[in-house]
């Protein structure tokens, strides 16, 4: 989980409270924020400052700043409750977006009259970097630029240019101008994030005088560097996913609002950002009480939700909940139930022992999986663990497989384009793992045991019409690997587990024709193995022969 270091003095002034160490250690965990440690450090002026390190759950990116933590804590403690209104005024600032294939989405906001000092400046920089990590996947999905608005003049333009088309002084090189290409070669950030620049096209943001504000996702220009004397801030967020870009902007401007900033919208190709329109969800009192095992009345539930900085209307035993724009984690009514539990007080829940006695034992399927695991480890393989979430390109297109929407379960609101569907096979994930480790020495022998999810229209037991199946898959890569090697491994595993099995010739689009076989157990097909097709190897940007198997466990 990400951690943030917060100056205690800064937290106290934002909370408008004097906070003892005991209060911090007792109360913050109750609102879902763990206190890692409290320590002292020397600041730039030589004074001792007390620092609190918090551990933040990944589903609460609004807590990645001291401003967000203070807002949440004021609500939790009952100091400021209910929906916090964020007024957004229209500015005359305009941005023109020209074709930009590599990072097509961009959003802007203007926040004026921010009460800036060293602590505020440090908080802005920290939030920027934490959001890069938490929402931006290390700038791949989104990148944030913060600028001194008074140093430039609109309108602004976001476009792609060639590597030698313009020169500007990047942050850290105040007096040395470079081309975008030179920045990738010489600048620390260019060397680190240059891989995100595709096809030699460099995204750039310029003002009306062609001054460079930013070259996302690499570096800002030194012209708009934010200092403790800056008060009017222009925020740009570029990325590959529209929803993530807008969510990050909402979190950022709401944090600056806590510093007495006034939020102004910016016109980006005819659309105004930020959009802080609240969302609404309806939930019943009975549903909340049933889930929590409590008997709360409407007033108690409304009070708890108001502590979560939401507003609630009560009609016909139903609650209409008004959710702030920065709460991108509220995706389902179960999230509202969690907010009620948290703000009602976890300490008020009473544990009850069940009235029956049971004896625990390992699940039979897990015992079987453990046997598979031990066998593969004995064969000299390394075990890996991948996510169950994947995407159509990895599961089907790179594997040379045809597919339709009936072949996979799709995620309704995916957090990223890489995680849009539930995997139907483990083998593509192993090939991705080999790609990530292609710089390591060969041979590489890996396996994974895990769940795959398939659509089952005949399922009458659940509403989802889906079923989880357990599979094992392995892959071997080195210059001399061949069908005989994977056949030996597969037969060895099958003798240890299934006992009786048959092997027949098999044609599979992911494997070389004539070098693939299917596995039968009591006449039922349970898996396949063979040499991976060269096209598939190239699709995953790998360079050596690969053999693999995939077997159904249950």
Swiss-Prot record:
Pfam families in the record, alphabetically?
B3_4, B5, PhetRS_B1, tRNA_synthFbeta
Gene Ontology MF, one: phenylalanine-tRNA ligase activity
**EC top class, as a word:** ligase
Question: Where does the UniProt annotation locate this protein?
Answer: Cytoplasm
Q: Which GO terms describe its cellular component?
A: phenylalanine-tRNA ligase complex
SMART domains in the cross-refs: B3_4, B5
Against Gene3D superfamilies, the record matches this protein to: 3.30.56.10, Bira Bifunctional Protein, Domain 2, Phenylalanyl-trna Synthetase, Chain B, domain 3
| Listed InterPro entries | aa-tRNA-synth_II/BPL/LPL, B3/B4_tRNA-bd, DNA-bd_dom_put_sf, Phe-tRNA-ligase_IIc_bsu, Phe-tRNA-synth_IIc_bsu_arc_euk, Phe-tRNA_synthase-like_B3/B4, Phe_tRNA_ligase_beta2_arc, PheRS_beta_core
Question: Which annotated residues bind Mg(2+)?
Answer: 329, 335, 338-339
What does the record give as EC number? 6.1.1.20
Primary site of residence: cytoplasm
- Residue ranges annotated for the B5 domain, each copy included: 276-351
Q: Which domain of life is it from?
A: Archaea
Sorted keywords for this record are: Aminoacyl-tRNA synthetase, ATP-binding, Cytoplasm, Ligase, Magnesium, Metal-binding, Nucleotide-binding, Protein biosynthesis
Which reaction(s) does the protein catalyse, per the Swiss-Prot or TrEMBL entry?
Answer: tRNA(Phe) + L-phenylalanine + ATP = L-phenylalanyl-tRNA(Phe) + AMP + diphosphate + H(+)
Q: Which cofactor does it need?
A: Mg(2+)
Q: Name one GO biological process term.
A: phenylalanyl-tRNA aminoacylation
How this chain assembles, per its entry, is:
Tetramer of two alpha and two beta subunits.
Q: In which family does this protein belong, per the annotation?
A: Belongs to the phenylalanyl-tRNA synthetase beta subunit family. Type 2 subfamily.
- The name on file for this protein is Phenylalanine--tRNA ligase beta subunit
The record lists the organism as Methanococcus vannielii (strain ATCC 35089 / DSM 1224 / JCM 13029 / OCM 148 / SB)
Q: Which gene encodes it?
A: pheT
């Amino acid at each position: 989980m990400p951690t943030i270091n917060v100056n205690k003095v800064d937290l106290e002034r934002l909370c408008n409270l004097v906070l003892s160490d005991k209060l911090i250690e007792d109360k913050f965990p109750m609102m879902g924020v763990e206190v890692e440690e409290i320590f002292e450090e020397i600041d730039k002026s030589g004074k001792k400052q007390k620092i609190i390190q918090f551990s933040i759950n990944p589903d609460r990116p609004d807590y990645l700043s001291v401003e967000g933590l203070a807002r949440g804590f004021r609500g939790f403690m009952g100091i400021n409750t209910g929906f916090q209104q964020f007024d957004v005024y229209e500015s005359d600032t305009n941005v023109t977006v020209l074709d930009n294939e590599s990072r097509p989405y961009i959003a802007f906001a203007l926040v004026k009259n921010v009460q800036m000092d060293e602590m505020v400046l440090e908080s802005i920089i920290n939030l920027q970097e934490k959001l890069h990590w938490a929402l931006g996947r290390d700038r791949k999905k989104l990148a944030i630029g913060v600028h001194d608005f008074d140093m430039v003049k609109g309108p602004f333009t976001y476009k792609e240019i060639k590597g030698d088309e313009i020169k500007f002084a990047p942050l850290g090189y105040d007096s040395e101008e470079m081309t975008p290409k030179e920045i990738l070669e010489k600048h620390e950030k260019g060397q680190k994030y240059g891989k995100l620049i595709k096809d030699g096209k460099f995204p750039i943001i310029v003002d009306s005088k062609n001054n460079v504000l930013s070259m996302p996702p690499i570096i800002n220009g030194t012209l708009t560097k934010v200092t403790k004397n800056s008060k009017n801030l222009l925020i740009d967020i570029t990325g590959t996913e529209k929803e993530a870009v807008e969510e990050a902007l909402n979190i950022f401007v709401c944090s600056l609002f806590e510093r007495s900033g006034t939020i102004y919208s910016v016109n980006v190709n005819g659309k105004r950002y930020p959009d802080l329109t609240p969302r609404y969800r309806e939930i019943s009192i009975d549903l909340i009480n049933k889930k929590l095992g409590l008997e709360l009345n409407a007033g108690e539930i409304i009070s708890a939700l108001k502590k979560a900085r939401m507003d609630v209307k009560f009609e016909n035993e139903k609650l209409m909940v008004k959710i702030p724009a920065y709460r991108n984690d509220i995706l389902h009514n179960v999230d509202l139930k969690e907010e009620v539990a948290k703000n009602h007080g976890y300490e008020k829940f009473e544990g009850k022992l069940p009235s029956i006695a049971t004896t625990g034992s390992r699940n039979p399927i897990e015992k079987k999986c453990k046997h598979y695991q031990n066998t593969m480890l004995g064969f000299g393989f390394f075990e890996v663990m991948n996510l169950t979430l994947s995407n159509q390109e990895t599961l089907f297109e790179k594997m040379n497989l045809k597919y339709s929407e009936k072949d996979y379960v799709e995620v309704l609101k995916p957090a990223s384009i890489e995680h849009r569907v539930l995997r139907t096979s483990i083998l593509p994930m192993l090939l991705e793992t080999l790609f990530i480790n292609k710089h390591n020495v060969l041979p590489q022998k890996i396996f994974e045991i895990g769940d795959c999810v398939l659509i089952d229209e005949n399922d009458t037991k659940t509403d989802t019409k889906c079923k989880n199946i357990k599979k094992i898959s392995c892959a071997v890569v080195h210059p001399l690997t061949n069908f005989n090697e994977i056949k030996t491994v597969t037969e060895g595993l099958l003798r240890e587990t299934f006992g009786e099995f048959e092997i027949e010739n098999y044609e599979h689009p992911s494997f070389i024709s004539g070098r693939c076989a299917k596995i039968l157990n009591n006449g039922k097909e349970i898996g396949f193995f063979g040499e991976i097709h060269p096209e598939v190897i190239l699709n995953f940007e790998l360079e050596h022969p690969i053999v693999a198997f995939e077997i159904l466990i249950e």
